[in-house]
Amino acid sequence: MLRIIFLGTGGSLPTRNRNPSAVIVNLKGELLLFDCGEGTQQQMMRAKTGMMSLSSIFVSHFHADHFLGIPGLIQTMSFLGRKEPLTIYGPEGTKEFTEVFKVLGYCNLKYEVRGVELSPGDIVEGKNYVVRALKTEHSTPSLGYSLIENPRPGRFNREKAVELGVLPGPLFAKLQKGNPVEVNGKLVKPEEVVGAPRPGRTVVYSGDTRPCEAVLEASRDADVLIHDGSFADEMAGWAEESMHSTAGEVASLAKEAGVRQLVLTHISSRYTDDVGPILNDSRKVFENVIVAEDLMELEVPYRPD
């Protein structure tokens, strides 16, 4: 399972419908949080994501709308008896901010919280995935992130295995795990009955940024690109000045990268009552686009073999 839950999809100013930035990814039961704006823990409760399975927080940058939810979240998990360590990853300044988070409100955390500063190209290795930090273009030190699931084993050729004398049961399982088996004095190797590894899924999270080369390259053939889509195209001048992106700009990037699904987030408060201009500008260029809404969920399927 790879499920994306959009906890906060608003821009710099929260609105009645949109919380500040926060996106959680549930990858086979492990929770990864990308940005943690004010009110994120309540959104997690509303979405019923749980929080004790949260292993890491990836902060794109330290503007307030992307991190103010962290102090309350880490304190709540301490009150609930969390013992497992939590790592907060982010750009320059992450260690210093993390030390501040840990002492706000005189909270005596009952578990370890550590801050790790990443540079573009750095890789965080998980159980069955990696997260790669990307150089982005914003007005403060900033990073985007590419979540890349490990390749899956190739498809098992049952008919070929039987043809080679392997009976269904434990020997099938051994071959599927990459181990050779012996049948009637003959060695059957996994590569004889298991196809080439199949690619895992890729989700790219831009954080706040102008359209940039690093996000483009990371998004090539990605399953999902979650990108700053703050403004409609008519606001191109202000988007450039404030170091954000327009819907049309991001759609062009997604089209060039060959993304399967584009999701626009960090929606400016000027579109509180109507995201039509953003959606229309993006769909002129790239059809498979969604403007994210708070508590929206997106399942990311495996690609057909």
UniProtKB/Swiss-Prot annotation:
Cofactors that this protein relies on: Zn(2+)
Substrates-to-products reaction catalysed: Endonucleolytic cleavage of RNA, removing extra 3' nucleotides from tRNA precursor, generating 3' termini of tRNAs. A 3'-hydroxy group is left at the tRNA terminus and a 5'-phosphoryl group is left at the trailer molecule
Keywords from the UniProt entry: Endonuclease, Hydrolase, Metal-binding, Nuclease, tRNA processing, Zinc
Binding site for Zn(2+) 1: 61, 63, 138, 208
Molecular function terms from GO: 3'-tRNA processing endoribonuclease activity; zinc ion binding
Residues the entry annotates as binding Zn(2+) 2: 65-66, 208, 266
SMART domains listed in its UniProt record: Lactamase_B (SM00849)
Xref: Pfam families: Lactamase_B_2 (PF12706)
Cofactor note: Binds 2 Zn(2+) ions.
Catalytic residues, chain numbering: 65
Keyword Chaperone part of the UniProt annotation: no
InterPro entries assigned: Metallo-B-lactamas, RibonucZ/Hydroxyglut_hydro, RNase_Z/BN
Gene3D superfamilies in alphabetical order: Ribonuclease Z/Hydroxyacylglutathione hydrolase-like
EC number annotated for this UniProt entry: 3.1.26.11
SUPFAM superfamilies in alphabetical order: Metallo-hydrolase/oxidoreductase
Its job: Zinc phosphodiesterase, which displays some tRNA 3'-processing endonuclease activity. Probably involved in tRNA maturation, by removing a 3'-trailer from precursor tRNA.
Oligomeric and partner information: Homodimer.
Family: Belongs to the RNase Z family.
NCBIfam families recorded: PRK00055.1-3, RNase_Z
Protein name per Swiss-Prot or TrEMBL: Ribonuclease Z
Biological source species: Methanosarcina mazei (strain ATCC BAA-159 / DSM 3647 / Goe1 / Go1 / JCM 11833 / OCM 88)
